[in-house]
Amino acid sequence: MSYQQQQCKQPCQPPPVCPTPKCPEPCPPPKCPEPYLPPPCPPEHCPPPPCQDKCPPVQPYPPCQQKYPPKSK
């Protein structure tokens, strides 16, 4: 068994939970009669989970019976 297979024998870890993006502090509202609305936070994208980059999807090995059907007597 190669080192890569040994590494990937275990299933990949679930992707990490994305931290909630922190909005920058909005500027003080200008002295205007209109209500001031701060700009919405830009959406932050989760980085791809590192495990999926390295690890191919783990395929379970089929049981023996599927590969070698028992000989009928």
From Swiss-Prot:
Q: Per the record, GO CC terms?
A: cornified envelope; cytosol
Please verify whether the record's keywords include Phosphoprotein: no
Instruction: Specify where the region named Disordered lies, as residue ranges.
Output: 1-20
Q: Which UniProt keywords apply?
A: Cytoplasm, Keratinization, Repeat
Superkingdom, according to UniProt? Eukaryota
Induction and repression of expression: During squamous differentiation of epidermal keratinocytes.
Q: Does the keyword Manganese apply?
A: no
Major location category of this protein? cytoplasm
Tell me the GO BP annotations in alphabetical order. epidermis development; keratinization; keratinocyte differentiation
- Output the Pfam families linked to this UniProt entry: SPRR2 (PF14820)
Per the record, the similarity remark reads: Belongs to the cornifin (SPRR) family.
Designated name of the protein: Small proline-rich protein 2G
